[in-house]
């Protein structure tokens, strides 16, 4: 965990996603003593590189959840700032290629990008060099967009018969998971959220049911939600906005987004951010109309 913190401090962006941190926290042995390859947390494997003195120089997490069904491994890695440009990143990438049964040297005829995916958060120059060296090509892009909250915000106009209320812990989980699955059936990570995943996040320090806004009809049936998050530095996040497909087209997603922005501003957030798929042009246009601009890009490279 210390290596990940040092990497984030140096780069200004977290080297791994939230789900990796949650899996590490789920098993203290992994947090405090990561072996070269350890797979005792379901769906995870861990690779480390140490220097000659035994100091941790680099770390890679491999998500194996889709290996049996889709044959895909998804990895994220971090190299300690003191050990960069000394081969630690290359050793980790080669270990990942070996784990995926891929040759170190890419074949010119190999156009498949589905077997191994490796994230570069913030499109770090070192990651771009490694991708070029090992024949990894861009397979997916995730934009981080943001805006200040000290300017005028639109009104959250709701469709007739729709109200917004706060999430009720221990009550609303099944409905949220149902709508989330329908809203994100196309999304490889978000659409797979289970009730257990949701309850795990409820135990995080940042979780606040008052910032988990649910849009319901007159029968209290869930139509959509806006789950907000406040980071330790005070930055707000449009964490997830999900609308049931049967309800889409009436502006509910925009109204939920605005309601969440107002909530975050009321909580003292000076700025807000969100993540959106780079090819989701419809969502990007909505956010741009709400004065969001692109901050940076996460890239998933594949072979």
UniProtKB/Swiss-Prot annotation:
Biological-process GO terms, alphabetical: mycothiol biosynthetic process
Signal peptide from the UniProt entry: none
Alphabetical keyword list: Acyltransferase, Repeat, Transferase
Assigned EC number: 2.3.1.189
Keyword Transferase: yes
Residues binding acetyl-CoA 2, per UniProt: 241-243, 248-254, 280-285
A Pfam match: Acetyltransf_1
UniProt entry tagged with the keyword Phosphoprotein: no
MF (Gene Ontology): mycothiol synthase activity; protein-N-terminal-alanine acetyltransferase activity
All residue ranges annotated as the N-acetyltransferase domain in the record: 1-150, 162-303
InterPro entries, per database record: Acyl_CoA_acyltransferase, GNAT_dom, MshD_Acetyltransferase, Mycothiol_AcTrfase
Binding residues annotated for 1D-myo-inositol 2-(L-cysteinylamino)-2-deoxy-alpha-D-glucopyranoside, in chain numbering: 18, 189, 229, 237, 275
Domain of life: Bacteria
Assembly and oligomerization: Monomer.
Family: Belongs to the acetyltransferase family. MshD subfamily.
NCBIfam families membership: mycothiol_MshD
Purpose: Catalyzes the transfer of acetyl from acetyl-CoA to desacetylmycothiol (Cys-GlcN-Ins) to form mycothiol.
PANTHER family registered for this protein in UniProt: L-AMINO ACID N-ACETYLTRANSFERASE (PTHR43617), MYCOTHIOL ACETYLTRANSFERASE (PTHR43617:SF31)
Protein name: Mycothiol acetyltransferase
Gene name for this UniProt entry: mshD
């Amino acid at each position: 965990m210390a290596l990940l913190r040092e990497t984030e401090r140096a780069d200004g962006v977290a080297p791994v996603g939230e789900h990796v941190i949650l899996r590490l926290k789920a098993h203290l042995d992994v947090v405090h003593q990561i072996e070269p390859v350890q797979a005792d947390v379901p769906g995870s494997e861990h690779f480390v590189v140490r220097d000659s003195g035994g100091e941790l120089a680099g770390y890679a997490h491999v998500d194996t959840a889709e290996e049996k069904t889709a044959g895909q491994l998804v990895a994220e890695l971090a190299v300690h700032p003191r050990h960069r440009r000394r081969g630690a990143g290359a050793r980790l990438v080669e270990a990942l290629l070996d784990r995926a049964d891929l040759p170190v040297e890419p074949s010119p005829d190999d156009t498949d990008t589905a077997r191994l995916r490796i994230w570069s958060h913030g499109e770090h120059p070192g990651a771009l060099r490694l991708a070029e060296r090992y024949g990894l090509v861009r397979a997916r892009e995730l934009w981080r967009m943001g805006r200040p909250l000290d300017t005028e915000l639109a009104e959250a106009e709701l469709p007739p018969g729709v109200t917004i209320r706060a999430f009720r812990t221990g009550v609303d989980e099944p409905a949220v998971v149902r709508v989330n699955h329908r809203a994100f059936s196309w999304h490889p990570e978000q659409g797979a959220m289970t009730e257990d995943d949701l309850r795990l996040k409820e135990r995080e320090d940042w979780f606040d049911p008052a910032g988990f806004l649910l849009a319901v009809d007159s029968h209290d049936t869930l139509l959509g939600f806006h789950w907000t998050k406040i980071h330790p530095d005070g930055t707000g996040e449009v964490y997830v906005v999900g609308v049931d497909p049967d309800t889409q087209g009436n502006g509910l997603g925009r109204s939920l987004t605005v309601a969440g922005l107002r909530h975050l501003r009321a909580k003292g957030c000076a700025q807000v951010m969100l993540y959106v798929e780079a090819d989701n042009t419809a969502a990007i246009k909505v956010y741009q109309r709400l004065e969001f601009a692109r901050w940076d890009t996460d890239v998933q490279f594949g072979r």
